[in-house]
A protein has these predicted regions:
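DNA-contacting interfaces and partner/effector-binding or oligomerization modules
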Residues: 3-120
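Membrane-topology and secretion signals of cell-surface/extracellular proteins
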Residues: 18-30, 48-55, 79-81, 186-189, ...
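Structural motif
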Residues: 32-34, 57-58, 83-86, 130, ...
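Short, Lys/Arg-enriched, Trp-marked, Pro/Gly-tolerant hinge/linker segments that flank
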Residues: 109-158, 171-184
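Basic, amphipathic alpha-helical hairpins
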Residues: 137-151, 170, 174, 191-200, ...
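Basic/polar phosphate-binding segments, predominantly the helix-turn-helix DNA-binding elements
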Residues: 149, 153-180, 205-230
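Terminal helix-turn-helix DNA-binding modules in bacterial transcription factors
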Residues: 173-208, 234-263
Length: 303
């Protein structure tokens, strides 16, 4: 049976031409910084899955996970391996190979999600955002409808809810306001297209209803702090969702606690109380305000 003395984890990062051995895995776990376009490769054949579960399960938000299965004899000896792997929400599961090919991993990493609404919703759950089934459905539908509508009024009509009811549902769950999720979902669709094609930012923006490439670029930067040029040079989409969550949290729009994040940053009790009052005022204004706010995109496209 093949046994390797090497560490069970590698990193796969730009320029995506090789796997980088990760010897100090503890340095990755709990690391607060964003890792744009980085994935963790877990070689189950190089260690003990139960012992190595922690780094895979508690990897930083935005870091995708690729799992390389052990040789067949070890799979038969440990039928719980797939249950262990599933708990870590892997991007892909690869058959055993002593030296996985970087090109093969890159091709998998570059694939767009098969079901973007469900996968974004699953990612939010993995990050520790717990909501009831109805709110989860509304989140998934918002991401789904982002390909068809561009205003929260149009979104509310499609969801058969008033803007107030929709906003209250998101607010009670500690989520960003619906318009932010809608606009981020549109930006995420643009990012995936930028990664997969050579289309210009203007072409991608026009296809999604933005006035020009600058409008798309500015929207993306406001929501995530990321520009299209960086998106295009990196693979994956989870890190962009993570960038959005962190931006919302820093600005008070996300009150739900992210897994591994401090409950409320470094703010003391007085700051938290003042922030809560500001959030409630902001949410009330957004519920009653115009669709044409600074974060809103162009008018809904004609059907």
């Amino acid at each position: 049976m093949f046994r390797s003395s090497r560490m069970p984890f590698d990193l796969f990062a730009p320029p995506y031409d090789r796997l980088i051995p990760l010897e100090a895995v503890d340095d990755l776990v709990g690391e607060p910084k964003l890792w744009p376009g980085v994935s963790l490769i877990w070689h189950l054949g190089r260690g003990k899955p139960t012992r190595d579960l922690g780094p895979a399960l508690h990897r930083p938000g935005g870091v995708s996970l690729f799992v390389v299965l052990p040789p067949s004899p070890r799979l038969r000896q440990n039928p719980d391996i797939f249950r262990i792997v599933e708990s870590c929400r892997p991007h892909s599961i690869l058959p055993f190979h002593e030296e996985p090919d970087a090109t093969e991993i890159a091709s998998l990493f570059a694939r767009p999600p098969m079901d973007l609404p469900s996968q974004v919703t699953d990612y939010l759950t993995w990050r520790g955002i717990q909501v009831d089934l109805e709110t989860r459905r509304l989140v998934r539908r918002t991401v789904e409808l982002s390909d068809e509508v561009s205003t929260v009024s149009a979104l509310s009509r499609r969801l058969y809810l008033s803007r107030r009811a929709l906003g209250r549902r998101f607010y009670n769950a500690g989520l960003p306001v619906p318009s932010h999720l809608l606009h981020f979902s549109r930006v995420l669709r643009a990012a995936i297209r930028l990664q997969r094609t050579s289309d210009s930012v203007a072409t991608v923006g026009n296809a999604l209803g933005y006035a020009d490439g600058f409008a798309l670029s500015n929207q993306m930067h406001r929501l995530t702090g990321i520009r299209p040029t960086e998106v295009r040079s990196r693979m994956g989409w989870e890190w962009l969702v993570e960038a959005w969550l962190r931006t919302e949290r820093a600005e008070g729009g996300l009150r739900a606690t992210l897994r591994g994040a401090p409950a409320d940053g470094a703010a003391d009790g007085a700051d938290r109380q003042a922030r809560g009052q500001d959030e409630r005022r902001a949410h009330r204004n957004r519920w009653h305000g115009s669709d044409r706010g600074s974060l809103d995109g162009p008018s809904e496209r004609a059907s």
